[in-house]
């Protein structure tokens, strides 16, 4: 019997949905044809059809929602995942039959037919090892996913500082951290031993977060210089970023004498969106800066772009601080930090200094310190 022979029947949209998740780890620019493919194979029980995608640095496998009608254990093939996903998406929810044999896979769906050439299953890279049983822990996936989502905005995009191109699961086992040197975000969450002092790379953040949020309590394991997560009928794995993460604790100021700016979070974010209409009209970074100035019981939020114009809005403050105060910072950084804080009321802590011009970090705390956001200010003209 040919090694690629199997027949399976399922709903095109359901199968396509699973392949859509797997496609997030496919290597887009690889010269290896196999890495642009999805691996389809019959599992050892001979009763289920599985699929896997890989970029060598990442691996994602899942059981497909199909009924296997024919196929012996190990039978399988490689198919271009973009083409297969596109065809399945056009099955309009109708049942689709997938038949693999003789270097081709055929799709039959309510009169629609297509045949795609396949590659031998042997050309696909080997998946990660199962890992040391002692290095396996159980986590509350939804809690970790929520923490990751809150800090992801602060991950560095500067590839020359590779250690910052991901989120840190801290050594203390109680927080997820991300920073790009100009801002920092920390979210408290309980971590198992195998996740401590691990930097999860940026390409894997969304994939892991999605699986964690859908799986609830699930297994995490360390294997092959990487980290993996096992959910219900699926598994994702990624290489870790090797290196020493900067001491982020030194960046978090412990202000003894500080001023608090308390306001409605959504109103503040709306004001930033308003001034961004002018600020974002220029390519210069200075034009994308928001200036925050305390004026009585309100916070004046403004932006000015040379040769473009200026905009402002006043945001009411509850219990406004005494005296004049002014600080400038990236409007995007402020808005993202505010959104991650999540609470109805936003509190920003600043050290105004003797002249009222803030030059030290802007600190945002929410949920009793379970979220901390920091934005470095810009020089006030």
Model-derived features with residue positions:
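Structural preference for solvent-exposed beta-strand-turn elements
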Residues: 1-381
